[in-house]
């Protein structure tokens, strides 16, 4: 009986999706449906785009979102559950003008955007407005394999790890596309294999189990999706991967076993993650170890935060991205909401070697901790050519950060054309903190470029630029067109930056 009910539910879901799609196609709007098991957002019960209804989604993390694709110019209307007295629509630099009327907020979009909305004291809400997918795979096409043909069905309750893993192995051996249709597929750890494309259709969700026993613990810990010793893997689509990290941490009272990464790579090459929503990691969301030639594009990453969920009993280490001992990594056109560092470039795990060429660009960031960071765990070897460019930082405790703590030599890092709206709300409250410190090793930092960066205001505490000693100095720091509080700043004093005696060759221009 349960299986019959589930089949009927899926058919109804598919019918409603098709009906909405036909209506929306006439308006150039593609609504993406809530996945089974997800609940509507009661704080924002309605979103309409060109008068087409878009599903709103509530999450266990006390934030919500709506997701759609569009072409041309569209009008977005968001309905809140109460009269709008104050609102803040970010990123500010996009210059999108919004109007409030009663409990309705309206604005227009002419290109894909990821928007952060705060209304009154309501929980935060996100608008994920994508471009339409180009040639998404369809069941029945050559090389496309439907998950349902492998005895895997949508189920709110069934744990299907082994069946899904066998399907992955089979499709990867054929270098095919595994099509995950709309529905909920609950699973423990899944290992990707070389040659696989994993496609999550709109309305599809791979959801963790919330049970530690479903995640075998290795030397590096546990993970939901594992790219281990593989190459040429694609994870794409407009569906969701949800790690159930909050439930995992509650289930074991925050034990090490519950700190499950959402995606971990180890010795992976030539892999792409594109378009999907990534939700609820147990700790660092994306940990990339000893890997190369990786790309994350148009992702949407949402992890638990202590500001959204103050009743959570443990401090959260929910970093967004941690490229670690890896090279040639591009993270772009995405959205990060997390409690710990949005990105922290590290050199800690794997067989340590020098790392080079990490690019974090065109992203929207909201974090409780550091926004654009190198460190803390950087050991012994060289880290070169790390670039943070064209990012919109909505909220952070620190904006530009280098913690050269454990002996690494960091060379030629760049922060170019980033915009910072709010800095504060946590322990340090600094626009910038760049320093060398002996925490198991004495490092070096050379040739820092901070160009065309804008901070809307001064941070509550002074920024900091501190070398360690007469040998372990920060050498060569260029501030080019640094704007704070509406004015170009031309000296450390003017920019409210504390500089110690172990910094050489600072210039402003």
Model-derived regions, located:
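Bacterial N-terminal signal peptides that target proteins for export
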Residues: 1-9
């Amino acid at each position: 009986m349960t299986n019959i009910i589930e089949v009927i539910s899926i058919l109804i879901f598919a019918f409603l999706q098709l009906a909405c799609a036909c209506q929306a196609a006439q308006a150039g709007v593609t609504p993406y449906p809530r996945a089974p098991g997800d609940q509507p957002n009661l704080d924002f019960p309605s979103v309409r785009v060109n008068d087409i209804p878009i599903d709103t989604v509530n999450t266990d993390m006390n934030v919500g979102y709506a997701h759609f694709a569009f072409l041309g110019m569209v009008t977005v209307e968001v309905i809140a559950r109460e009269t709008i007295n104050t609102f803040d629509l970010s990123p500010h630099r996009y210059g999108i003008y919004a109007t409030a009327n009663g409990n309705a907020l309206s604005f227009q979009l002419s290109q894909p955007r990821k928007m952060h909305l705060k209304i009154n004291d309501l929980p935060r809400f996100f608008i994920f407005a994508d471009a339409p997918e180009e040639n998404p795979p369809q069941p029945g096409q050559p090389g496309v394999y439907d998950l349902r043909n492998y005895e895997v069905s949508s189920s709110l309750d069934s744990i299907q790890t082994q069946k899904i893993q066998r399907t992955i192995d089979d499709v990867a051996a054929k270098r095919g596309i595994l099509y995950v249709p709309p529905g909920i597929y609950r699973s423990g750890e899944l290992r990707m294999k070389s040659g696989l494309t994993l496609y999550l259709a709109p309305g599809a969700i791979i959801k963790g189990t919330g049970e530690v026993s479903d995640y075998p613990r290795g030397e590096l810990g546990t993970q939901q999706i594992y790219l281990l010793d593989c190459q040429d893997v694609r994870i794409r689509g407009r569906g969701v991967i949800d790690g159930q990290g909050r439930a995992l941490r509650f289930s074991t009272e925050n034990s090490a076993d519950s700190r499950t990464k959402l995606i971990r790579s180890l010795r992976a090459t030539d892999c792409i993650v594109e378009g999907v929503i990534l939700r609820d990691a147990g700790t660092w969301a994306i940990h990339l170890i000893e890997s190369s030639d990786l790309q994350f594009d148009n992702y949407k990453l949402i992890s638990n935060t202590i500001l959204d969920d103050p009743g959570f009993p443990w401090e959260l280490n929910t970093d967004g991205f941690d490229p670690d001992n890896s090279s040639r990594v591009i993270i772009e056109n995405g959205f990060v909401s997390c409690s710990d560092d949005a990105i922290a470039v590290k050199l800690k795990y794997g067989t340590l070697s020098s790392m080079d060429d990490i690019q974090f660009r065109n992203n929207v960031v909201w974090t409780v901790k550091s926004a654009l960071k190198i460190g803390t765990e950087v050991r012994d070897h060289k880290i070169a050519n790390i670039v943070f460019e064209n990012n919109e930082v909505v909220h952070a405790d620190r904006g530009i950060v280098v913690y050269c703590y454990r002996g690494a030599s960091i060379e030629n890092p760049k922060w170019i054309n980033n915009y910072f709206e709010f800095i504060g709300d946590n322990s340090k409250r600094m626009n910038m903190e760049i320093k060398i410190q002996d925490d198991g090793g004495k490092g070096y930092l050379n040739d820092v470029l901070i160009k065309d960066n804008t901070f809307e205001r001064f941070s509550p505490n002074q920024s900091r630029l501190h070398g360690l000693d007469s040998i372990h100095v920060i050498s060569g720091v260029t501030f080019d067109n640094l704007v704070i509080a509406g004015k170009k700043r031309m000296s450390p004093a003017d920019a409210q930056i504390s500089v110690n005696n172990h910094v050489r060759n600072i210039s402003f221009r």
